[in-house]
Curated annotation (Swiss-Prot):
Assigned EC number: 1.3.1.98
HAMAP family reported in the protein's UniProt record: MurB
Described function: Cell wall formation.
Molecular-function GO terms, alphabetical: FAD binding; UDP-N-acetylmuramate dehydrogenase activity
One CC-aspect GO term: cytosol
Record localization: Cytoplasm
Listed cofactors: FAD
Domain FAD-binding PCMH-type: from-to ranges: 34-213
Catalysed reaction equations from the record: UDP-N-acetyl-alpha-D-muramate + NADP(+) = UDP-N-acetyl-3-O-(1-carboxyvinyl)-alpha-D-glucosamine + NADPH + H(+)
UniProt gene name: murB
Name this protein carries in UniProt: UDP-N-acetylenolpyruvoylglucosamine reductase
Lineage: Bacteria, Pseudomonadati, Pseudomonadota, Alphaproteobacteria, Hyphomicrobiales
Taxonomic source organism: Parvibaculum lavamentivorans (strain DS-1 / DSM 13023 / NCIMB 13966)
Pfam families: FAD_binding_4, MurB_C
Keywords for the protein's UniProt record, in alphabetical order: Cell cycle, Cell division, Cell shape, Cell wall biogenesis/degradation, Cytoplasm, FAD, Flavoprotein, NADP, Oxidoreductase, Peptidoglycan synthesis
InterPro entries in the cross-refs: FAD-bd_PCMH, FAD-bd_PCMH-like_sf, FAD-bd_PCMH_sub1, FAD-bd_PCMH_sub2, MurB, MurB_C, MurB_C_sf, Oxid_FAD_bind_N
């Protein structure tokens, strides 16, 4: 746990908020892995104005980390120093604007795809296959089933570390595969997506196909962090992992999924270290057998606690 005195001193240095500040807040319940350490301070802003004021008033030396719904996130046992920001209800808005969909970045990807479908807007069906929030999709150029965020984004609204708002166009995001080139200190709060008029029943049919495909090929009903590694150019990570003999491989309470071996699973009592160590073992075996270095897609944050450490 974080040192109580240091945490109290940190909170004293933070500005007053309308949202919620929680000291030594457990983050494991906020991640799909259900493993990991605590945030020194967790901030849940009431809305974008609350977030902007908080960032403007927070000393520059205080580390700030933003998280979403935790679907593609691993929090190390040593915890996350400084302030962890998690956007909530004030950032879940979804509105239809002509042939566009405007969404807050805490809105779930599946909710955005559903809103577009109900409005008869095609093009956002792929979000049905991404188990995360819009903020994560913006930051990682989230994609599935042949489409990516870069294919549908019109603009994104963000707040920088000084509390200033910015509107970024698609080009400003400098998207590449599973990567956004926008400054790391920007916190996205809203996005506008372009749809195309379509038949609502046809759109729903495609979304249901995506759901069926996910259920048949991915361990979606387990404690998992989604796709573990990015696909290297010219390769599929799961094929490299399978060829390296890693399907079903275990370390502590962590396991490589038997169903889809680019997914790591918490079988019930895995620590964050179990999960990360298993991922590194997979990377080493793939490197040895194929010469390819896998790059993590799961975001890992916090301080690593060495085994046997206090």
């Amino acid at each position: 746990m974080m040192a109580a005195e240091a945490t109290a001193a940190l909170i004293d240095r933070l500005p007053k908020v309308r949202g919620e500040l929680v000291a030594d807040a457990p983050l494991a319940p906020l991640t799909w892995f259900r493993a990991g350490g605590n945030a020194e301070v967790l901030f849940r802003p009431a809305d974008a104005d609350d977030l902007a004021a908080f960032l403007a008033g927070t000393p520059a030396d205080v580390p700030v980390t933003i998280i979403g719904v935790g679907s593609n996130l691993l929090v190390r046992e040593g915890g996350v120093p400084g302030v962890v920001i998690r956007l909530g209800r004030g950032f879940m808005n979804i509105e239809i604007e002509g042939t566009c969909v405007r969404a807050g970045t805490a809105a779930l990807d599946v909710a955005v795809s559903r809103a577009a479908q109900e409005a008869g807007l095609a093009g956002l069906e792929f979000y049905r296959g991404i188990p995360g929030s819009i903020g994560g999709a913006l930051r990682m150029n989230g994609g599935a089933y042949g489409r990516e965020t870069k294919d549908v984004l019109v603009e994104a609204v963000a707040i920088d570390r000084a509390g200033k708002r910015h509107v970024l166009t698609n080009a400003d995001m400098h998207y590449t595969y599973r990567h956004c080139g926008a400054p790391d200190d920007l916190i996205f709060v809203e996005a506008l997506f372009q749809g195309t008029p379509g038949n609502a029943e046809d759109i729903l049919r495609r979304m249901n196909e995506i759901t069926s495909s996910r259920e048949a090929t991915q361990p979606i009903r387990t404690r998992t962090g989604g796709s573990t590694f990015k696909n290297p150019e010219g390769h599929k990570s799961w094929q490299l992992i399978d060829a390296a003999g890693c399907r079903g491989l275990r370390k502590g309470g962590a396991q490589v999924s038997e169903l889809h071996c680019n997914f790591l699973i918490n079988t019930g009592d895995a620590t964050a270290s179990d999960i990360e160590d298993l991922g590194e073992e997979v990377r080493a075996r793939v490197k040895e057998t194929s010469g390819v270095t896998l790059e993590w897609e799961i975001r890992r944050i916090g301080i690593r606690k060495e085994r046997g450490g206090a």
